[in-house]
Structures are given as C-alpha cells and as structure tokens.
Amino acid sequence: MLKNNLDVRQELAALYRILDIYGMTDLANQCAAARSSENKNTFLVHQYGMFYNEITASSLIEVDNNGKPLDPKSPWLNDGCLNLCKWIFNTREDVNYYVHGHSENVMAVGGT
C-alpha cells in the first residue's frame, strides 16, 4: 500500500519518539530522516534544537535534494543531517528512512 506524506510524517515523528524512549539521543547532531512519499526528490528532517520528544508530524521540515527547505521561512536545520540526507537519499533510491547516531545502542544495531 502506498503511503501518503502524512503517514510518512507520522512515522518519522514516531521514530523520533522511539529513539527518545530508548535513550538514543545523547548528541545534538544525531538525526533521522525520511524521503517524502509525494516527491521522491524531497525529504523530511527535524528542526535543529528540538528535543526528540518534542518532534511532531507537523514540526518536520521538507527540504529538496540539495538540502534547501521548501519553505524559505523554515527554522534553522542541522547541516550535518542535511549532508547525510543528500548523500544517502540522492545515491540510494531504495532508501526511504535512515537514522544517524552515535549512541552505543545505535552502534550495536548498526553493527548487526
């Protein structure tokens, strides 16, 4: 079943909540992102400075495949996260979500 963009936003916001619940939020520059279901050349990221437990579907920001927000009034974004989004989503069309982190829990999952 194809997902609409609201579904993707809700799933990404839920992913941030799960990361928070499991303590995978120990660095400011960690991030999770999702490819938009409506435009495969855009992706969703969180606003820099928000705690993971504060992120909602409506607070996610859509950016183009060059890392530029679609809404020019968007708040500040994490440059490191945007670079990873560009590298991953522009290279791998089969990837729709990703998590970048440095906590021991994330490294354990990433290493299996």
Regions found by a protein language model. Name each.
Residues 8-97, 106-112:
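An anion-binding catalytic pocket shared by soluble metabolic enzymes
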Residues 100:
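Short hydrophobic beta-strand that contains or immediately precedes a catalytic carboxylate
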Residues 103:
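Active-site metal-binding loops of divalent metal-dependent hydrolases
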